[in-house]
Amino acid sequence: MSLQHIIEAAFEKRAEITPKTVDAQTRAAIEEAIEGLDSGKYRVAEKIDGEWVTHQWLKKAVLLSFRINDNELVAGSETNYYDKVPMKFAEYDAARFQQEGFRVVPPAAVRKGAYIAKNTVLMPSYVNIGARVDEGTMVDTWATVGSCAQIGKNVHLSGGVGIGGVLEPLQANPTIIEDNCFIGARSEIVEGVIVEEGSVISMGVFIGQSTKIYDRETGEVTYGRVPAGSVVVSGSLPSKCGKYSLYCAVIVKKVDAKTLGKVGINELLRTIDE
């Protein structure tokens, strides 16, 4: 019986599973899946033939991990905590950090089951179980990477950014930020929204599945996906009756990778009225 099949079968009877009743095979399978997510061997979502595919069985393994463990004491630098999920770096020493090749600034917190790639920097931030933060990415101060979220290469998550998770409330697919994106301070990308490669999200932009994404060049309104190379700011659209306006995200321009590499982020955002 494959690892996936064991997880799928266990999930169907998840209401019956507790730390005391879980059988050895199921526990071993769940722990192997979490270890695979932690090491980067597995990922909850990946791009296959140009389309994002969610491996639902791995998401189910994350959910099941909460069923098989009791709360226990988690040691912190200044205090103690009490939780079902251990911290990723609990057993790390200097040699292990050097081997992994990333920087972690206190009091950044990363749960076991999240993958952190080389050349990333974690300022005082939070990365939840099942998430993946790829190479060269900066997770800035007080940014949050939610459960199972996928953060690409060379991404900058600015201060206070929130990237939504899949566990609370339960979502079908993870939130995805593709390679070479910039997410401005205090912005929120949630509910499985995909921000495609090379996009720039300005400060204070909120995008969920029900958020209208208005392209001012075409007049088109879309939902749930920011096209590659978009520069996005917060805005509003008038109601049909014309008596009020409702929030939306506005694509003010498109840039290619060459332009993005030559022009600073601030310059792109300063010239949105051109």
From Swiss-Prot:
This protein's pathway: Amino-acid biosynthesis; L-lysine biosynthesis via DAP pathway; LL-2,6-diaminopimelate from (S)-tetrahydrodipicolinate (succinylase route): step 1/3
Pfam families: Hexapep_2, THDPS_N_2
Compartments in which it is found: Cytoplasm
One GO-annotated biological process of the protein: lysine biosynthetic process via diaminopimelate
EC number: 2.3.1.117
Name of the protein in its database record: 2,3,4,5-tetrahydropyridine-2,6-dicarboxylate N-succinyltransferase
Organism expressing this protein natively: Pasteurella multocida (strain Pm70)
Record PANTHER family: 2,3,4,5-TETRAHYDROPYRIDINE-2,6-DICARBOXYLATE N-SUCCINYLTRANSFERASE (PTHR19136:SF52), MOLYBDENUM COFACTOR GUANYLYLTRANSFERASE (PTHR19136)
Membership in a protein family: Belongs to the transferase hexapeptide repeat family.
An annotated Gene Ontology molecular function: nucleotidyltransferase activity
Keywords: Acyltransferase, Amino-acid biosynthesis, Cytoplasm, Diaminopimelate biosynthesis, Lysine biosynthesis, Repeat, Transferase
Species classification: Bacteria, Pseudomonadati, Pseudomonadota, Gammaproteobacteria, Pasteurellales
Gene Ontology annotations for the cellular component aspect, listed alphabetically: cytoplasm
Enzyme class: transferase
Binding site for substrate: R103, D140
Catalytic activity of the protein: (S)-2,3,4,5-tetrahydrodipicolinate + succinyl-CoA + H2O = (S)-2-succinylamino-6-oxoheptanedioate + CoA
Disulphides: none
Subunit structure: Homotrimer.
